Amino acid sequence: MSLYDKAKQTADFIKSKINNIPKTAIVLGSGLGPFAKEIEEEVEFDYKDIPNFPVSTVEGHSGKLIFGKLGNKDIMAMQGRFHFYEGYSMKEVTFPVRVMRELGIKTLFVSNAAGGTNADFEIGDLMIIRDHINFFPEHPLHGKNIEYGPRFPDMSEAYSKELIDKALEIAKEKGIKVQQGVYIGTQGPTFETPAEYKMFHILGADAVGMSTVPEVIVANHCGIKVFGVSVITDLGCLLYTSPSPRDG
């Protein structure tokens, strides 16, 4: 069965169970699963019960697909994502985004936990992702083009400027401190060495993690608008900015 046929089969299964399919989806990254408790009137599915879906193997990723209301908005939420380092192919990592396209999702919010490479950041900061660097060894669009989008997608605005501006406006109104920056995605599963943190900083990255980029690429290929945010959970920049001990 082709990837297209699998995505359609999975979407048809979900449509048979859910009356109101939302237009907005959220991917909850590492440690952010508890946010799902804010969703009301929910209907949830374990990933293992969804045809063709991979299964989360990482602690902190519950592996549930949730439909319900967040505020007054219908929402679809992935409580846990799939990572390249788990042994999945990029086609499998990004399969849920293909399903979103089949469901008619128009906007995707992605979140992750990330290490800060920017010395101006603090642990706990929220960084709005304004761009990314793809450092993965495999590309999710490698191979025959699937007719969800063009062979060569435009990535000049991978993260919606309209959504970024709206988020900045809301953050200002609510007095929420936010950073903006570039996220670099790596394959993992090892955390970065001090030299790697320094290299990523030189390349222009403000935060580094092991997810998000593949999903965003496929979302853009599918014509889905994206907003991304990183929670800065550690500061790798301290490893390469600290004074080095010297003899004499």
Please annotate each region the language model reported.
Residues 13, 17, 162, 166-176:
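Generic non-transmembrane alpha-helical segments
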Residues 1-155:
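Metabolite-binding pocket within alpha/beta catalytic cores that recognizes anionic/polar moieties
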Residues 74, 106, 177, 206, ...:
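Residue-level detector of anion-binding/catalytic polar loops
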Residues 148-160, 185-187, 197:
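Polyanion-binding loop/helix "lid" in catalytic or ligand-binding cores
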Residues 240-248:
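Single conserved hydrophobic/aromatic residue that forms the stacking wall/gate
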Residues 194-201, 205-235:
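A C-terminal functional module that forms or caps the active site or interfaces directly
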Residues 174-206:
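Active-site/ligand-binding-proximal alpha/beta "capping" segment
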Residues 30-32, 115, 132-133, 182-188, ...:
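Glycine-rich beta-alpha junction loops
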